[in-house]
Amino acid sequence: MTRLLSTGRPPAVRAPSRAAGAAAFTLIELLIVVAIMATLIGLLLPAVTAAREAARRAACSNNVLQLGLALHNYEFHREAFPAGVTDAAGPIKSLPEGRHVSWIVRLLPYLEEQALARHFKEADGAYAAANAPVVATVISSLICPSSSAGSVEQWPVRNAAGPAPDDSLDDLPSEIPQPRRVAVSHYAGSHHDVEAPIAADNHGMLFLNSAVRFKDIEDGSSRTLLLAERVAPPRPPHELDGRDDLGWASGTRATLRNTSVIKSSAYGAAAWGDQQPVDPLFVGGFGSFHMSGICVSAMADGGVRQFTPDIDPDLLRQLGHRADGEIPKDDGGW
């Protein structure tokens, strides 16, 4: 019988196969992969954000183009641009009183909103209870896709005990008529070249009881601002004053602005400073919801232009005057 001789050494241990451990990651390798992925995401996110904002700005430009086209169609049929606001007398206060029928109301048939036009009772005014369902209707072409604000404004209700709940109608002041809920417009017509109340002697294209014709635009339609974006400064809650947005049917600062300034919502509430309007006669300038601060606008010839907040103030003022006889600069932020 053959006997196996002991060598005195422990039996050999087979080393693990290289193929068996090839699929596993070490901790260092995993951390490297995570770091690479984080870097790629950090590089791609700004590009994605910029692409989305560019798409929103293009949609906003299309809204402005459609409004400009509607104004031109109105002028073609009526031989004059619509009144910026229709009322018995001015100056116009940004408070829910009077008729205050806006230029947007006149444009409803040209914005494919014939149903709203038929149901709006112009003789009753923008704040009449009979017009509540109409003025609470959101019109998509009046909303900027980049807006951080809502498309509907809720008017506050106050009583002697302080702010009332939104659904309360107790002690509704008689000077604050219905409706309390209104749809807004992020676009406004140009009523004047400097800060001034909305009145019949304004220098812009759309103002109190106006009926501007092309022959009245002595500076040239391509050099006269027709409409542009606007942003609203913040207002304290439960305070009804000149800061309230009275909706697209109201021919107040809700739908009319001047070329005194271009504001960007990207600067935040602090950018408004002392220009927060407390006086109901205050109108304010145009503004933008876009990240870049670009304000999309339409000229009187229908062309769509883009302004920046750092536009030359003199150039901006000149564009807001239809017949000042001055030659606007060819640069300066437009």
Which residues fall in each region the model found?
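N-terminal leader/signal peptides at the extreme start of proteins
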Residues: 1-25, 88-90
